[in-house]
Amino acid sequence: MKRRMFFSIILTFLLITTSFVLAQKEWVTVSESQWQGSFSDVFFFDAQNGWIVGSNATILNTTDGGKTWTHQPLPFNTEFKKIRFINAKTGWVVGENGTVLKTLDGGKSWMKLSTGTLVALLGVSFVDEQNGWACGDGGFIMHTTDGGATWTPQPIDTNNTIEGVHFVTPQIGWAAGGGGTLLHTTDGGNNWQFQTSATVNTLDAISMLDHANGWAVGAGGAVVSTVDGRNWEVQQSNVPNSNGMPEPIWDVHFADKNVGIAAAEFGVILTTMDGGITWKPLEHRPVAARLQGVHMISDSEAWIVGDKATILHTTDGGNTWDVVSNANELRAVHFFNDELGWAVGLAGSVMHTSDGGDTWRPQNSGDVFELFGVGFVNEMKGYIVGSNAALLETLDGGTTWKSVSDPGDEGHGRAKRIKFGGDMSWKSAMASYAMSFGNPTHAWAVGETGKVMRTSDGGKTWVGVDIDPGFSGAGFNNLFGVHFVDEKVGWIVGFGGTVAKTTDGGDTWSITIGYAELQDIYAISSELAWAAGNQGTIMVTTDGGETWIDQTVPTEENINAILFIDEKSGWTVGDKGTILRTTDGGVTWLQRNSPTTNNLRDIIKTPNGTLWIVGDSTTILRY
């Protein structure tokens, strides 16, 4: 009797403990950017003290060489453009609506100065605690001789926007801007004289080492330089043409007469070791965001900032860069097994884990546009789909990705692997928004204007599929979600409530239209499936799509992805950190605690049962 009571007590204890553990299981944040928004400029007074400014009145400060960054809150919302310090305590920030801020304590507190203008200020330069200049829209330059307490506009003979200004003494300075404008003054800006820039491209930034040596950069990959402060010559930037034309260069900074770094569009970083005679683009871009500000502390150490809260740091002269911050939007995640996973997103971003998600590292996709779907055939071979007709392939686990869709690459035999019938072409098909593997050899991708592709040989060839030969309208709708149960049975959903189903591997399709805009679908069998979409839409079919029943959902947020473990257990994720769960096939959906308010884009399950979610601001969650 005592033994039976003892085992009863132990069993009760184990049940209570197990229930407590299960009740306590929550989603855990593996990755999430600390910062959001766009960073426009970075400035270091010395190796330890630095500042970053950007959108939403953002000012970040470090006093330990960038190991930690502290946000300096302000009681207003303005987009800041440039920041400059003349010592570790005294600095100025300029931005939209004629905004000028000043600090005397290293940024612990900021005072807003009266400027008498609402012009968007884009550049600022101070040579000491009293003498400074700011420039902006409409050919605007203003000057202060009392540290910013009062400002006086200076007349210049142009209406072109002045993007940057740089003074080396209280008398000698330069300004650069629209239409290749270059201005020079030797009397503190009382008189500005035009200099020939040798380009008609907008010059977005100017950086002078001294009274003679300087560089200006801008649109169309323009780089011009001077060695005497008067005559400017064009330098060949060798900037890539990611979008069919040379990338704009947004900023440039030199450590000395030889070593310089330029920051450009789509994550392009240029370095020179000979004063710009030769510029070398970084082969593997750490990010693909717009890079707007660069500052060199020495010939080896530099910082770059840009869109998507990007902060980059190098200690080897720009050969390699650490990604300190990047708030990219991750759109899809895929695990081939419990250890190997990939997440893809905007600006060509690819994240990879080889340790079950404990650590994620960027991979270079070679693409700079949006990536929406990813899938792997085996540990080495995988595919990514995205905008601009992107179809990328890797044969080495993501170390290198190559396009299999570039018509200009037919000489290498890759473009011929894309086969479309009739009037359809790869380029006219535009973006792909999702992909699904029915098995290791059969995969599907869907996208813009009814685009559907399939492979039945593990990606060796991809064939275009017309799901709407009867012209019901679905063939022109954007398709956002696809899920195949096996190589024969699959579902597609999209704009206008489009639902398409095949039971013969895509040879024929049944189509219905008229539900809310649907973003994703998950099927357990040819009969049982759930679809999810905008404004909290979740619906279920138990008869193969003949009828759909709306399910009650405790949110009106857009639902972006849906996953079912079995016929009863399912999850959805959506905007503003929405996570829903059901344990009864969707009869009831309950809101789960979410560790983020970022939009969540995808959810998947690994073979061992671990769940993964990805979303905006490089959010990665594990359950």
What does each model-identified segment do?
Residues 1-7:
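Bacterial N-terminal signal peptides that target proteins for export
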Residues 9-17:
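Bacterial N-terminal signal peptides
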Residues 23-623:
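Residue-level hotspots at or immediately adjacent to binding/recognition sites across diverse folds
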